[in-house]
């Protein structure tokens, strides 16, 4: 998953920063935070991929749909800003989970100049939705089960 995110990020970086001179952009190695910030849930041990628990909400119209943000703290700075010395330290991805069929849709990806999806936002001009069916016994599937179980109670109680 981390390789896919980095590949997509590098592709977006190339598209967004074509006019910036490469000589000014040295490779920036980052030291992501080692402590997990309150309100964030690490998906995999020793991987900087988190769910922002404060961003989770259930759709009013379709209670099987849960919206949330995933955050990736980067270990290399990405030059996605017009300023040649500003770089992204994190990526925030807006996702929608369908608890009825375990389809996960990535709606939007934004870059931030601080860790934890904070700070100045840079959004790619073109973004495509991407939906995948989660496979049982994978980290994302297990996380989806937990999200659906915890937030499923909220909408099943409302139906009474």
From Swiss-Prot:
Keywords of the record, alphabetical order, are: Cell outer membrane, Lipoprotein, Membrane, Palmitate, Signal, Virulence
Q: Which InterPro entries match?
A: Adhesin_E (IPR043088), Adhesin_E-like (IPR031939), Adhesin_E_Pasteurellaceae (IPR016595)
Indicate the principal place this protein occupies in or around the cell: membrane
**Residues bearing covalent lipid (S-diacylglycerol cysteine)?**
16
Q: Name where it's found.
A: Cell outer membrane; Cell surface
Q: Does the keyword DNA damage apply?
A: no
Is Membrane included in the keywords of this UniProt record? yes
The task this protein performs is described as:
Acts as a multifunctional adhesin involved in direct interactions with host epithelial cells and host proteins.
Q: What is this protein called?
A: Surface-adhesin protein E
């Amino acid at each position: 998953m981390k390789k896919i995110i980095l590949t997509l990020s590098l592709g977006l970086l190339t598209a967004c920063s074509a006019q910036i001179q490469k000589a000014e952009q040295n490779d920036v190695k980052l030291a992501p935070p080692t402590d997990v910030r309150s309100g964030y849930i690490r998906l995999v041990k020793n991987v900087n991929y988190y769910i922002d628990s404060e961003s989770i909400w259930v759709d009013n119209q379709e209670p099987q749909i849960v919206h949330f943000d995933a955050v990736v703290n980067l270990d290399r700075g990405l030059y996605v800003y017009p300023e040649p010395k500003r770089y992204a330290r994190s990526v925030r991805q807006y996702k929608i989970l369908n608890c009825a069929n375990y389809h996960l849709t990535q709606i939007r990806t934004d870059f931030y100049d601080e860790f934890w999806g904070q700070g100045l936002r840079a959004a790619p001009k073109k973004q495509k939705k991407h939906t995948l069916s989660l496979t049982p016994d994978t980290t994302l599937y297990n996380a989806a089960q937990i999200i659906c179980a915890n937030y499923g109670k909220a909408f099943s109680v409302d139906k009474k």
